[in-house]
Amino acid sequence: MKIQPFGESQPNADANKAKAVRQAVANLIDRDELATKVYKKTYTPMYSYIPDGLAGHEDTLKAAYGENGKPSVDKARKVLKDAGVTTPVDLKLQYNGDHYGSSSADEYAAIKSQLEEGGLFSVDLQQTEWTQYNKDRVVTKDSDGAYPVYQLGWFPDYSDPDNYLSPFFRDGNFVNNGYSNKEINDLIVKQAVQTDENARAETLKQIQRLETDDLSTIPLLQGAQTAVAGSNVKGVVLDASFRFRYSSVTK
């Protein structure tokens, strides 16, 4: 989910309030509910920017927001109050069903309900056809984009942590939401050429910790891999390569 309220082109532009709104949202999201009730455990909660199973993965969002993975209205209320944000916050939440599937309607109806818990947000849930959606979401030199908060999915081009960072957080990224953080940008460049696995893993964790504070995006769910095999079939392996390994399968 991409979040950019109170952006530079908005009439009430305020960086501190914008960050508080993002952090309040992060405190209210219940990923377990989305994974179990909407997707029947075909997705799992994601509390990091690098998926579980890849180098550098760390559940930074779980520690920073909510109560150990569960939502916290009290924390959300406090962060908004401390920033001087008047509640309820009017928030337009955009999603797309023809590209991301019919379950998106149920997912974002649940998110709307979660965000409105405690009366902190008033959410206007909207759906747009994909071609228009993909145009309207981006930031240009004249606009912060038409959608303050919107759905965005991702399937990696290759199985490496960098493919979950560079496309989202480097300057000139494909998300094109106007986000820029020099420290994060420099660290992403650094990890891409590190050959020491332990050193790179630490750099990757540092990037996630910084982004957990910025919250230019809020990860929600990670796809779960599933294989069905007979009881007499052994050696079925599912891993971060996203490839089914026939060489290990025996009967």
Regions found by a protein language model. Give the residues of each.
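Solvent-exposed, polar/charged alpha-helical surfaces in well-ordered, non-transmembrane soluble domains
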Residues: 1, 19, 23-27, 32, ...
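Pocket-flanking alpha-helical
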Residues: 1-3, 33-38, 131-169, 192-193, ...
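Short, solvent-exposed loop/beta-turn-alpha elements that line the ligand-binding surface or hinge
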Residues: 1-19, 55-75, 138-145, 166-193, ...
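Alpha-helical secondary-structure segments
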Residues: 1-47, 91-100, 195-213
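Solvent-exposed loop/turn segments at secondary-structure junctions
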Residues: 31-34, 41-45, 52-56, 97-101, ...
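Short, solvent-exposed loop/turn and secondary-structure capping segments
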Residues: 36-40, 48-49, 103-105, 161-164, ...
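Structural transition elements
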Residues: 45-82, 99-106
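Ligand/substrate-recognition segments at binding pockets and active sites
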Residues: 81-156, 169, 225
